Regions:
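Beta-rich, blade/repeat-based domains predominating
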Residues: 21-33, 64-79, 107-122, 156-173, ...
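Residue position within the beta-strands of beta-propeller blades
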Residues: 37-39, 80-83, 123-126, 175-177, ...
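Structural signal for beta-propeller blades
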Residues: 44-47, 87-91, 130-133, 182-185, ...
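Short loop/turn segments that connect beta-strands within beta-propeller blades
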Residues: 50-54, 93-98, 136-140, 188-192, ...
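Solenoidal tandem-repeat scaffolds enriched in leucines and small polar residues
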Residues: 99-193
């Protein structure tokens, strides 16, 4: 969790460029050891920077399609990738050192968001299926249960329109970046009607969003949102919502983004952003941490 009024350096460093990660990157994940994972959609490989390294030191020759959009890693090191190619499927890699895979499920929709909760349940956002579904990973069944959405695009509280990133907190409440409805929806456990917690239809409108693609929470349940078509990252605290980085509009300079897609924090509070149309991953340092140049700086509990 972050202190109130935390700030990030407005000029980012480029953590990975197009030569490394290919064009139009989307997926990103950082595990509890500060290992960073992304997908090069141009060659179907998973790239891994282990344990806060600045150099790619593991590459999985995964033979993924150019439509592999989302990646996550569980606490026991298993890697899950949503590959929305000709066969739309969720693939499990046994660990970071193996190309051995298992198909967990095949689906009928592109998947732009994956999440595993504390009960080892996998959640998937079905982009053109306008739903979020889930599957218990300890089960051999490939059946998926619907958690949110009706299967048709719409603006009602029980509907979604091209959902992207998802997050499930310790209460098993689901947050959805409801992309084409320009809002963040909260579906409490067991509820099919969502509550708009950020965006254009929020009852307490404090921030407008344009095609949000990712949402995560910190330990205080404050939201961090990829506001994709406004080319900025939004954060919240006890004072409400605010732009935290890339607040000057679309561009390619170190303080700008061009259609950001995914975000993740390392345990030092530094913010990593997949900057899709600039074909790079940008690192915005938490202002008090000096980008980890001093290794004894405070570590932050980023995720719930």
């Amino acid at each position: 969790m972050f202190p109130t009024n935390s700030t990030w350096d407005q000029n980012a460093t480029t953590f990975a460029n197009q030569t490394q990660i290919g064009s139009d990157p989307i997926g990103l994940y950082i595990d509890t050891n500060n290992s960073i994972y992304t997908i090069n959609k141009n060659n179907g490989r998973i790239l891994i920077w282990m344990n806060n390294s600045n150099d790619t030191n593991l590459i999985l020759y995964a033979q993924l399609s150019s439509s592999a959009y989302s990646i996550l890693v569980t606490t026991n090191g298993q890697i899950y990738v949503a590959d929305s190619g000709l066969i739309k499927q969720i693939i499990q890699f046994s660990n970071s050192y193996s190309n051995q895979t298992t198909t967990i499920a095949t689906v009928s929709s592109d998947i732009y968001g994956l999440f595993v909760d504390l009960n080892n349940t996998l959640y998937c956002s079905m982009f053109d299926g306008h739903q979020v579904v889930k599957k218990w990973l300890n089960s051999n069944s490939s059946a998926m249960a619907t958690v949110a959405g009706t299967g048709s695009a719409g603006t009602a509280s029980n509907m979604l329109s091209y959902p992207n990133g998802i997050f499930v907190d310790t209460n098993f409440d689901l947050y959805v970046a409801d992309r084409n409805n320009h809002r963040i929806q909260l579906f409490r456990l067991g509820q099919t009607n969502g509550i708009t917690v950020a965006g254009n239809t929020s009852p307490n409108l404090t921030i407008s969003l344009s095609y949000p693609t990712n949402v995560i929470l910190d330990g205080n349940k404050y939201l961090f949102i990829t506001d994709s078509n406004n080319h900025r990252i939004i954060g919240s605290d006890e004072n409400g919502f605010r732009c935290i980085v890339a607040c000057s509009g679309q561009g390619s300079t170190s303080n700008q983004l061009n259609v950001p897609r995914s975000i993740a924090f390392d345990s030092f509070g530094n913010l990593f952003v997949v900057d899709q149309n600039n074909h790079r991953i940008q690192k915005f340092c938490l202002s008090t941490n000096f980008c980890n140049r001093e290794r004894k700086k405070q570590r932050f509990d980023i995720f719930i």
